[in-house]
């Protein structure tokens, strides 16, 4: 009985640490923003987060991690809202590593062609 309890406690602590690391934003400057304009190369609507690749005119490819499906659906974003080929402007917190091409703390996405706009209302 005691071993089972200790095993359960250890497992819950490991899970808590993993969840905390998953949502750690220490690699980003949360108090700053950058604007990146480009074309969506691919987009994947699946949990835990919707992801897409964004190619700039300079040929740089950024891997973007958006919110989860439920959060996006509450914001009226569905699997057909954005698609490969859409030109967008992404406003996000920049990574502390200037060579990083990963953007996670998305604050805003605009599609200039039709004026569509998404703004973050909750923390990812």
Label every model-predicted segment.
Residues 1-8:
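Bacterial N-terminal signal peptides that target proteins for export
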Residues 20-34, 47:
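Transition segments tied to proteolytic processing and entry into folded domains
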Residues 46-55:
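Short aromatic-glycine-enriched beta-strand elements
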Residues 74-90:
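Short nucleic-acid-contacting surface segments enriched for D/E, G, S/T with interspersed K/R
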